Design a protein with these regions (language model features):
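Glycine-rich hexapeptide-repeat left-handed beta-helix
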Residues: 1-153
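Intrinsically disordered, low-complexity serine/proline/glycine/threonine-rich regulatory regions
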Residues: 152-160
């Protein structure tokens, strides 16, 4: 069935069966959530002052069957997440493909935009120019986090 308790899920998100998150730390402590963006140091954690915090999943993100989100995970917009059998990283930047346990560029941002257009058209809607502009702006302001995560992924041996 899956469980996404105490989570915030964006629009047009497609969750594979049994996508699950933890919303409680094993030590019952309050949850820190990674945040990124202009004016913030990379890897900044925001203390939630709460013991029940699920995941933050951006618009147009897709997960495979059996994806496991960590407590307080932050996943950007237009991501593709492939399950590894292990909990996901706590941060996956906008536009990233998480495959084999590492963040990659995948087939690129244009393919993600095409996929978002296909998802909306399947439901008789269209991805407007304004929607595309917002997604492009999000991508632009988070580009440094994306490139850092991809670079780190290239140095990490892939999990089988």
């Amino acid at each position: 069935d899956g469980f996404l308790g105490h989570s915030y899920v964006g629009e047009w998100v497609n969750l594979g069966a049994n996508t699950t998150n933890s919303d409680l730390k094993n030590d019952y402590g309050s949850v820190d959530v990674p945040v990124y963006g202009e004016g913030l140091e990379p890897g900044t954690l925001v203390h939630s002052y709460d013991t029940k915090v699920g995941s933050f999943i951006g618009d147009h993100t897709k997960t495979s069957i059996g994806t496991l989100f960590n407590t307080g995970s932050n996943v950007g917009a237009m991501c593709l997440i492939m399950a590894t059998g292990q909990p996901l990283l706590k941060f996956v930047p906008t536009g990233a493909w998480f495959i084999g346990g590492v963040v990659t560029k995948g087939f690129g941002y244009n393919k993600l935009t095409e996929t978002a257009k296909a998802a909306t058209s399947r439901r008789g809607r269209s991805l407007s120019e304004a929607d595309i502009a917002v997604l492009n702006h999000i991508r632009e302001i988070t580009k440094s986090e994306f490139m850092a995560a991809v670079k780190k992924g290239r140095r990490t041996p892939k999990k089988s």
